[in-house]
């Protein structure tokens, strides 16, 4: 392999060509690979709870999806129901509800032109914080991962901001320090001027396990569909049949702010 000095000895053109190869290699490797969301879900029996946010290929709609899964009877005994402009989890059979903490909450709330999506009651924390002029990230500083040892389930959150024909979004994960509850690791990912056809996917667990391993890395780059019905069907059919519980999908018109939503519940 030629060194930079050897390339320079061959003359400036050789030096430039050598360095361009290095630059081009770095340029090619720095881009995140777009993943198949369908494949990601089909190959993971238990991602836990998941949030998808993105923009349709035609650039006209902001998209979010939220799903919940469960392994225990208590966790599986849930449905999504509409509440105002958002949704709430509810016990399907109240007589079987053993512990409402951590499983009964509002995953989706709307504050003006902002749509908040989370896997816990931090939805309310974000709503109240932003209503008092705090940022998304600042609002979450008072929260940390869930106290469900030994899993210490991460709190995942997302926010969509649609205003004046523009769309930005952000995602957050609060998780234990590699399973140690003494420290909380906080990560926020912001996406300005969201690109058409692209979205990001974050979920609570890397895979099934005991204890359940927390999500690692930044949100995954995934494709988004123009057709809400097709997107909803793909998501629901890709989730593990035994573990899936409920799915929520919303498409928001970026120009008008009007939205359409779909809810799919396994319990009927």
What are these regions (language model features)?
Residues 11-31:
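Short, Lys/Arg-enriched N-terminal segments with co-localized hydrophobic residues
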Residues 28-268:
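Conserved short alpha-helical segments that host acidic/polar catalytic motifs at enzyme active sites
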Residues 5-8:
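Tryptophan (W) side chains
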């Amino acid at each position: 392999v030629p060194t930079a000095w050897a390339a320079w000895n061959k003359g400036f053109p050789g030096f430039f060509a050598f360095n361009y190869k290095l630059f081009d290699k770095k340029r090619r490797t720095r881009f995140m690979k777009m993943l198949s969301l369908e494949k990601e879900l089909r190959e993971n029996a238990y991602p836990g709870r998941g949030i998808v946010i993105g923009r349709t290929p035609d650039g006209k709609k902001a998209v979010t999806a939220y799903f919940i899964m469960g392994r225990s009877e208590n966790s599986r005994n849930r449905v999504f129901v509409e509440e105002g402009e958002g949704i709430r989890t509810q016990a399907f059979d109240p007589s079987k509800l053993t512990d409402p903490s951590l499983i009964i909450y509002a995953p989706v709330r709307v504050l003006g032109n902002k749509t908040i999506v989370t896997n816990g009651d931090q939805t309310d924390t974000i709503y109240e914080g932003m209503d008092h002029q705090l940022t998304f990230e600042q609002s979450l500083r008072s929260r940390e991962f869930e106290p469900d040892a030994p899993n210490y389930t991460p709190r995942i959150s997302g926010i969509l901001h649609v205003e004046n024909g523009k769309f930005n979004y952000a995602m957050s994960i609060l998780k234990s320090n590699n399973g140690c509850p003494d420290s909380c690791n906080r990560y926020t990912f912001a996406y300005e001027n969201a690109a058409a056809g692209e979205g990001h996917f974050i979920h609570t667990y890397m895979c099934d396990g005991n204890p359940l391993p927390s999500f690692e890395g930044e949100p995954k780059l995934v494709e988004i569909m123009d057709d809400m019905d097709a997107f909803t069907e793909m998501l629901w059919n890709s989730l593990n049949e035994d573990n899936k519980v409920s799915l929520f999908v919303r498409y928001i018109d970026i120009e008008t702010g009007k939205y359409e939503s779909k809810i799919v519940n396994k319990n009927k």
